[in-house]
Structure formats: C-alpha cells, structure tokens
Amino acid sequence: MKNNEKVFLLIDTSGSMIENEKRSILKYVYRPFKTIIGDRLLAYSWGDEIKEVSKVSELRMQGKINNETTEKFLNNLEENSHLVIMSDGSFETDIFKKLEKKVNMYFVGIGSDVDKKILEYTFGKNNYFEAYDILNLANWLKREIS
C-alpha cells in the first residue's frame, strides 16, 4: 500500500441521526478512530450535501441524504480508496451497489435501530462493524495504509 493513502469517512448527518443518542455514540466512536488513523483521516458530513469537517462536535443533524451528491462523491474517490461510513443505515443502499470502481467500503452501525442484515448484504458481512468494534477496524485500516 502507498504511504500517502487516506481513509475517507462519511458521517451521517441526516435527521434520523438525532434519535436515540446517536450523536453521542458518533462522538464516542470517532475519537479513538481519529487518534489511530491520524492525519490520514478525511472526515465529511453526509446529508443534504457532503463537506469536509474538522470538528465532529460541531456537526448538525438535519435533513436527509442527497443521493445525487452521494453518487458524485463516490465517483470522485480513487480506485481502491478506503471509505468508512458511520450511520444508522437510513439511506438508499443501491447507490453503493452501483459504484463502478473498486472502493474498499466499511460500515459502522450507529444506534440500536440499525438494519444489520441489509447493511451486511450491501457492504459484505466482513465489512460491517458495530460501534463497539471501532478499534478493530481502525487498527486494521492503520496497517492497510501504512
């Protein structure tokens, strides 16, 4: 793997993330993830638009996922990029299935209402992680990009 590889992180900021303390869970799993990956992590808010964020604590949860914006973002990723999605899974999974190039995608389920079966089907059983498993994913990615 290249020494300059980045890990792209999409953080779901849609309105469904307001429910059931998901924002608190998100902050809890983000900190160790950021610490392990370091400056190779590029975090983006993912909702009506996708934009890079520097402080996860300032994210506002509102609106809904914009499929067109998501598709453009995904198509701009380089082949074999590492993409981590932190979400409750309330979005259309077909966008990710349509991706023409190979992108290594991992999903971190946030909240108790995550539909694990659909997400495992979409991203692969080995690419789905519960929030409590974030350290395993982060350490594995660190080895992949080093």
Q: Model segments located where?
A:
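Short, Lys/Arg-enriched, disordered terminal segments
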Residues: 1-4, 143-146
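Short, surface-exposed, polar/charged, turn-prone segments marking secondary-structure boundaries
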Residues: 35-39, 70-73, 110-113, 133-136
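A short, well-structured beta->alpha microelement
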Residues: 62-75
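Von Willebrand factor
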Residues: 2-55, 70, 79-86
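VWA/integrin I-like adhesion module and closely mimicked acidic/polar interface patches used
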Residues: 21, 57-65, 89-144
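N-terminal low-hydrophobic presequence detector
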Residues: 33, 40, 62-63, 146
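Solvent-exposed polar/charged
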Residues: 35, 76, 121-122
